Amino acid sequence: MINIGLSGSTGKMGKTIIEIIDQFKDCQISGKFNSTNNLNDLDNLCKNSDVIIDFSTPEVSEKLINYALKHNTKLVIGTTGLKDQHFKLLEKAAQTLPVLYSANMSIGANLLNYLAKKITKILDEYDVEILEMHHRNKKDSPSGTALMLASTIASAKGFNIIFNRDNRIKSKKEIGISSLRGGNVHGIHEIFFLGNDEIITLKHEALNKNSFAIGAIKSAIWIQNKPSALYSMQDIYKV
C-alpha cells in the first residue's frame, strides 16, 4: 500500500483527490496538510508518507521540498504560481529523490501540449496566441497550463512570451497569452494558429477537477520505483 500525504487538502484539488482516492486500491491518504496547519507540520507529513501530492501555495511548496529532502519523500507537485527560486529548488531536490512537477496533470491538457509542439513546427509562418479561462477565484494569472503551452511553442519557434500589448502592434516573433476570470470555470485553454487565409484552433476544456486528480494519483503511483530525477507528465503519458 502506497501512503500518500496530501498538501493542500482543503483546496479544490485536495478535496477532489480525497473524493476519488478509493478508486485506487493500491494507495491511501496517510496524512493531510492545509492552510490552518503550522508549516512545521509538513515535517510529520513527509515522515509518514511515501510520496506527497502538493496542491498548495508556492510558500508551502518551498517548505515542503526541504522536509521531503530530509525524509527522502517522493514528490508530486501540482502547485502553480511557482517562481524561478522554486524551480531551482525542485531541480536540487531531484538530484536526491524522484520529483514530478506539472502545471496540469490531465491527459487531455498534456496531449494538447504535445499537439501544439507538432503543429507549431509545421505552421511556421502562422501567428500564435493563447487564451485561458478559469473561475473567478483563481489566484495566478496567466495559468500554469497556459505558461506550459506557451513555453512549449516558444521553444519550438524561438519566440518571446508576452502578457501585455498596450499601445503597440504585435511582433512577428511573440506569443501572447490572454486571461479571462469568471464564474465557476474549471479550465479552458485555446491555442490559435492565425494565418492570412485561415485559423486553426486547438482547445481543451476541463469539465471538472477529476481528470487533474486522477493524473496526480497516477503520478504518485508511477513515481514509486523511479530513480532520482525531475519528471513531467510527458514521461508518464509518453507524449
Curated annotation (Swiss-Prot):
Residues annotated as the enzyme's active site: H134, K138
Reaction catalysed by this enzyme: (S)-2,3,4,5-tetrahydrodipicolinate + NAD(+) + H2O = (2S,4S)-4-hydroxy-2,3,4,5-tetrahydrodipicolinate + NADH + H(+); (S)-2,3,4,5-tetrahydrodipicolinate + NADP(+) + H2O = (2S,4S)-4-hydroxy-2,3,4,5-tetrahydrodipicolinate + NADPH + H(+)
Enzyme Commission number(s): 1.17.1.8
Domain of life according to the entry: Bacteria
Gene giving rise to this polypeptide: dapB
GO molecular function: 4-hydroxy-tetrahydrodipicolinate reductase; NAD binding; NADP binding; oxidoreductase activity, acting on CH or CH2 groups, NAD or NADP as acceptor
Subcellular location: Cytoplasm
Record-given protein name: 4-hydroxy-tetrahydrodipicolinate reductase
Coiled coil: none
Binding site for NAD(+): G8, S9, T10, G11, K12, M13, G78, T79, T80, S102, A103, N104, M105
InterPro entries, sorted: DapB_C (IPR022663), DapB_N (IPR000846), DapB_N_CS (IPR022664), DHDPR_bac (IPR023940), NAD(P)-bd_dom_sf (IPR036291)
Keyword Transit peptide: no
This protein's pathway: Amino-acid biosynthesis; L-lysine biosynthesis via DAP pathway; (S)-tetrahydrodipicolinate from L-aspartate: step 4/4
Summary of the function given for this chain in its UniProt record: Catalyzes the conversion of 4-hydroxy-tetrahydrodipicolinate (HTPA) to tetrahydrodipicolinate.
Record-stated family: Belongs to the DapB family.
Gene3D superfamilies hit by this protein: Dihydrodipicolinate Reductase, domain 2, NAD(P)-binding Rossmann-like Domain
Primary location: cytoplasm
